[in-house]
Amino acid sequence: MPKSAVSLFAILLLAASVITACSPQTRPDAMSVVQERQVLRVGTLINPTSYYFDHDREQGFEYDLAKRFADRLGVELEMVPRFDVNDLFTMLRRGEVDIVAAGLDRTSTRAQLFRFSPPYDIISQKVVFKQGSRQRPRDLQQITDGEIVVVEGSSHHEFLKSLGDSIPTLKWRATRDHDAVELLQMVISGEVDYTITDSTALDIQRRFHPDLSVAFTVKHDQDIAWALPQGKDDSLFAAVIEYFGEIRSSGRLAHIKEQHFGHVKQFNYVTTSLFIEAVEQVLPGYIETFKEHSGSLDWRLLAAISYQESLWNPRAVSPTGVRGMMMLTLPTAKAMGVKSRLNAEQSIRGGARYLERMLNRVPARIPQPDRTWFAIAAYNIGFGHLEDARIITERQGGNPDRWVDVKKRLPLLRQKQFYRHTRYGFARGDEPVTYVGNIRRFYDTLKYLDEQGRL
C-alpha cells in the first residue's frame, strides 16, 4: 500500500475513533455514573418536612428516604441543600444533582420539564390566615381584605399564575426572600395576611402556632414525588421506581412516614393553646428538676410525659388512685423509692426511673425512635398488655418491632375475640395510642421552643 494511502487510512481510522468516542451511545448511563462516583447527589430544601440538622446530625423525611435509596445502591449520600426550589431545578437541569427530593408537588408544568417518581405522599394546598384577625373567607373571591403571599417558583405560585385575570379583586405576590415556614410565621406576626401552604407543613407548624387557621382548600390530592432529569436514559429512573415499589409493599414507607408525621395529623386548638400557655407560665418552675432527674433521658421528653399525665400539677389525683406530677400508682411509687407522690421532685425522679425501666425491657433490637414510643406506651398501659399487642401484630402479619404496626393492633385489646387469646386479657388499648401521639406532639413542641431559645 502506498505511503499516502496508509496515511489517509490512519487519519480516517483516527477520525472514526474520535467520532465513536464522542457518540452519545458510548456515554455511561446515569446509574453507572452514580456507581462510578460512589455518591448519590440529592438536592433538597432546608425545612422541617424535608431536611434539617438536629445536634449536628442530618435529619428529615426526605433525608431518610434518600439515605435508604443510596444504601440500596451501595453508594454514599450527598445531600445538596438549598433554600430556593428554583435553585434545585436549575441544578437538576445542569446535572449538578441526580435527584431532587424536596416534598415537590407533581404539577403539570413541572411534569413537562422533569420526570417524577411514583408518588410517596398526597397533600392538599390550603389558604391560611391568623385566627381572630379577620372574617374567614370561603373562597378566593371573598379575599378582598388582604393579600396572599407565596414562595416564588412554588406550586402555590404556579396555581395563582394559572388564575390569570379571572378574579380581578384578588391581590397576591410571590417572594424569594422568605420560605414557606417563614411565611406561616409572618401570618402569625401580622406581616402577611394570607399564604398558601401544603397540608403537611401546616400540620407541623400548628403545633407551635395554634392560631394558624385554614380558610379553605384550593387543591386536593396533590402527588408528592422526586424529580429526575428528562431524557432517554432510564437507568436511575427505573431504580427509583423499583425502590418506591419495594418500600411501599414492605411497609417501610409507612414506617418512615409514621416516624416523621404520624403524630402531627391530629390538631386540637384548645389543647395546643393551653400547652403553649403552660410552657410559658408553669414549666419554668420545674425545668431544673426535670433536667436533674432525667438521667439518660431527654428532659424535654420527661416534661412532655408529665404534662400529658398531670398538666404539670404536682397535686393531681385521678379516680383510679394515681397521683402527682408523673401520676404514679402506689406500687410503682414504692418500687421507685418515692415516699410522697405529691412531692414534685420525688414524683419526677420516680417517673424517670420507671420510664428507664420500661426502656430497658423493650427488646434491644428495636431501634429508635420506636423503642421510646414502645416504652412510653408501656408506661401508660403496662408492659404485659404491650407485649400482648405485639403478639397480635405478629399473628396478623405485621411487624411487632414497629410502632406504626403495633399501634394499629393495640385497640384490639378491647375486643373479646382478641383479648381472650392473650396472657394479660382486656385493656383499653386505644388509650396508649392517643397517649403516645399527644406526648410526641408535646415533645416536638418543647424541642422547637428550646431551639428557639424560648425555654
UniProtKB/Swiss-Prot annotation:
CDD domains per the UniProt record, alphabetical: MLTF-like (cd13403), PBP2_YfhD_N (cd01009)
Catalytic activities: Exolytic cleavage of the (1->4)-beta-glycosidic linkage between N-acetylmuramic acid (MurNAc) and N-acetylglucosamine (GlcNAc) residues in peptidoglycan, from either the reducing or the non-reducing ends of the peptidoglycan chains, with concomitant formation of a 1,6-anhydrobond in the MurNAc residue
Cell location: Cell outer membrane
Annotated spans, Non-LT domain: 22-264
InterPro entries linked: Lysozyme-like_dom_sf, MltF, Solute-binding_3/MltF_N, Transglyc_AS, Transglycosylase_SLT_dom_1
Main location: membrane
Name of this chain's protein: Membrane-bound lytic murein transglycosylase F
Organism this protein belongs to: Idiomarina loihiensis (strain ATCC BAA-735 / DSM 15497 / L2-TR)
Gene that this sequence comes from: mltF
